[in-house]
């Protein structure tokens, strides 16, 4: 797995496919290859997929003594996409990754072509205590031995088999204390947005997901029936069809947002060059790809053909 230096970290990542860039952010204690295993084969046909390991996860080493803060994950993402040369991109986040995605969207909405978040609430409520209990290593040892073994394998690389024992309490300490996003914050998120949740999610009540989708300027909601927190893996057909349909429906807007940002960047570069002549730089390269910058075009034709998407599970609800 390659790495790139960003925000003081060697961020490990997976990359698949070719096309407009799509960044996928995994949940706490997980990895992109696990959370999005059912999405990678399908969406790599039309997009260049980037799946970075969050700090302390997988192969992205992290100084446990420094602590863990959710806003640092936003800084990490910003540094990662800058280092990758991704001016604009599609962004999908799950759980912890969804919070990172939302906070990045507040900070830099103009960078996003579209936004999709799964299993996320922007409200403080009692269910955060559920997450905190799950992040207790002593409880995990006693009640979840299979999960403990998996965590050891998942986060062992370069950090030691017990790395997760430092990671869980660090994440738990920041759950419920990170700043809440306000209605004003959410109104800044102007790219087309999809909010997805399961109707049996132990962490996110449906009314919270519904409220989030209503507060986003261009939001829509997917509710997965009979599903808990991990909509992408528990209802992959439903989620894949909904996400592919979302990309089809917003393709023109997404392309326009990418072009608008490119024009602004070119104008800023021209103004800088005219005010202070400098040597012409070498052609920009994408350090993640090792060759050319990620494509900035529109979605590939397969998105117009629903037969390419996995068949949806019966009974999905969108609003």
Locations of the language-model features?
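Acidic catalytic loop of the alpha/beta-hydrolase fold
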Residues: 200-204
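Catalytic active-site module of serine/aspartate enzymes centered on a nucleophile-bearing elbow/loop
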Residues: 219-220, 225-266
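Flexible "cap/lid" loop of the alpha/beta hydrolase fold
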Residues: 99-107, 112-147
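Conserved HGGG/HGGXW glycine-rich cap/lid loop of the alpha/beta-hydrolase fold
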Residues: 9-62
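Short beta-strand/loop motif that positions the catalytic acidic residue
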Residues: 189, 195-197
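Short alpha-helix in the alpha/beta-hydrolase fold that links the catalytic acid
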Residues: 191, 205-214
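Conserved acidic catalytic loop of the alpha/beta-hydrolase fold
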Residues: 71-89
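Active-site nucleophile elbow and catalytic-triad environment of alpha/beta-hydrolase enzymes
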Residues: 170-185
């Amino acid at each position: 797995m390659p790495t790139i230096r960003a925000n003081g970290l060697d961020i490990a990542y997976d990359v698949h496919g070719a096309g407009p860039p799509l960044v996928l952010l995994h949940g706490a204690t997980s990895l992109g290859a696990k959370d999005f295993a059912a999405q990678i084969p399908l969406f790599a046909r039309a997009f260049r997929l980037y799946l970075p390991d969050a700090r302390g996860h997988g192969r992205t080493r992290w100084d446990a003594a420094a602590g863990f803060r959710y806003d640092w994950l936003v800084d990490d993402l910003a540094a990662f996409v800058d280092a990758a040369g991704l001016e604009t991109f599609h962004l999908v986040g799950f759980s912890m990754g969804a919070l990172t995605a939302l906070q990045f969207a507040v900070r830099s909405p103009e960078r996003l072509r579209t936004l999709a978040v799964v299993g996320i609430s922007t409200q403080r409520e009692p269910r955060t205590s559920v997450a905190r209990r799950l992040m207790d290593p002593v409880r995990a040892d006693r009640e979840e031995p299979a999960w403990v073994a998996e965590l050891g394998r998942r986060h062992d690389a370069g950090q030691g088999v017990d790395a997760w024992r430092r990671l869980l309490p660090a994440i738990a300490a920041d759950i419920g204390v990170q700043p809440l996003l306000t209605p004003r914050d959410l109104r800044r998120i102007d790219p087309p947005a999809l909010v997805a949740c399961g109707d049996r999610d132990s962490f996110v009540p449906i009314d919270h997901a519904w409220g989030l989708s209503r507060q986003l300027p261009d939001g829509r909601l997917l509710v997965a029936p009979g599903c808990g927190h991990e909509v992408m893996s528990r209802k992959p057909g439903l989620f894949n069809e909904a996400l592919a349909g979302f990309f089809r429906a917003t393709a023109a807007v997404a392309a326009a947002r990418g072009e608008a940002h490119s024009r602004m960047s070119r104008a800023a570069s021209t103004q800088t060059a005219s005010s202070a002549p400098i040597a012409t730089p070498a052609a920009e390269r994408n350090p993640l790809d090792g060759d050319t910058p990620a494509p900035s075009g529109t979605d590939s034709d397969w998105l117009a053909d629903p037969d390419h998407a996995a068949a949806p599970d019966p009974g999905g609800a969108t609003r």
